[in-house]
Design a protein with these regions (language model features):
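Short, solvent-exposed loop/turn segments at secondary-structure junctions
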Residues: 9-10, 38-41, 72-74, 119-123, ...
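Active-site-proximal loop/helix segment associated with metal-binding centers of metalloenzymes
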Residues: 96, 110-203
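A broadly tuned preference for mixed-charge, low-complexity surface segments
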Residues: 60-66, 123-129, 230-245
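Beta-strand-turn-beta hairpins that frame and shape the catalytic cleft
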Residues: 1-3, 105-116, 185, 237-241
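Internal alpha/beta domain cores that form substrate/cofactor-binding pockets in large enzymes
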Residues: 161-251
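Short aromatic-enriched loop/helix-cap "lid" or pocket-rim segments at secondary-structure transitions
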Residues: 46, 79-81, 126-129, 198-200, ...
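Core catalytic region of metal-dependent phosphoesterases/phosphodiesterases
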Residues: 5, 10-109, 200-214, 218, ...
Length: 251
């Protein structure tokens, strides 16, 4: 069995047995895929008690939790985990059955091919990205707080790695070509540019990530594409599904 859900932002209560009772029939060979903004690796320098509790709690679920990165992850820590090969692609194992599916990889799950490409551009940055080491950091932060302008702080609440590198994009295309540009499912955080234009306002504009996913959309044959990021649940045409708090079975 494979289920898909959207952004968690470190709130994993949707996976308790009262809400997600289907897990009683699941084993570690069954999967729940989170479409980015997992948020379980967030504390600045190391895993704190709160994170440990929830990562251990997820590990104790009968299923295996998988996630792609969103734009709200601590990439310094996430990328500090050893890279391992798992089911055909590169991963970071937060726990034995809590696994980060790295960008541009193709995974074999339950006999189906999944192309995964997480990440997105943060849009809650009207006040800019602040440098915590800058001499005027506290002054700028105070001014922005007073004006109620949203901002992010470098290496504390924002990381440039939220956006894929050129190398990751190229690796993704190479991996897809090895499968003749044909997969069963695509998992991402944001979506292709043409898809995004169908349902969002001016808050979200095209960028290098959505343009790359547009290239994937035009080049690759796929059955279904699931993505998060936009905090809603809706079908965008017959093949693309925006998902947030719902947990839906796909296999």
């Amino acid at each position: 069995m494979i289920y898909v859900t959207g952004d968690c932002h470190a709130d994993f209560t949707r996976f308790n047995t009262k809400i997600f009772s289907e897990q009683y029939e699941m084993t570690k060979d069954d999967y729940v895929i989170i479409c980015g903004d997992f948020g379980g690796v967030w504390n600045r320098f190391e895993e704190n008690k709160h994170e440990k509790h929830w990562m251990d709690w997820l590990e104790d679920r009968p299923f295996t939790s998988l996630f792609c990165e969103g734009n709200h992850e601590n990439f310094d820590r996430l990328y500090s985990y050893p890279v391992e090969k798992w089911n055909g692609g590169n991963v970071h194992k937060i726990r034995p059955s809590v696994i980060h599916l790295m960008r541009g990889q193709v995974f074999q799950l339950c006999g189906k091919k999944f192309f995964v490409f997480g990440g997105a551009k943060s849009h809650d940055t009207d006040g800019g990205i602040l440098d915590p080491e800058a001499p005027d950091f506290k002054k700028k932060k105070k001014e922005l707080d007073k004006e109620w302008l949203p901002y992010r702080v470098n290496h504390i609440s924002w990381w440039k790695e939220e956006m894929a590198s050129k190398e990751e994009m190229e690796e993704g295309l190479r991996n897809l070509s090895q499968y003749n540009n044909e997969v069963d499912f695509i998992i991402s955080h944001c979506c292709a540019t043409s898809t995004q234009k169908q349902f969002v306002d001016k808050t979200f504009s095209a960028d290098s990530m959505t343009d790359y996913l547009e290239l994937v959309k035009q080049r690759v044959n796929f059955k279904k594409w699931f993505f998060g990021h936009y905090h809603d649940n809706k079908n965008i045409g017959p093949k693309e599904i925006l998902i947030y708090e719902q947990i839906i079975r796909i296999l």
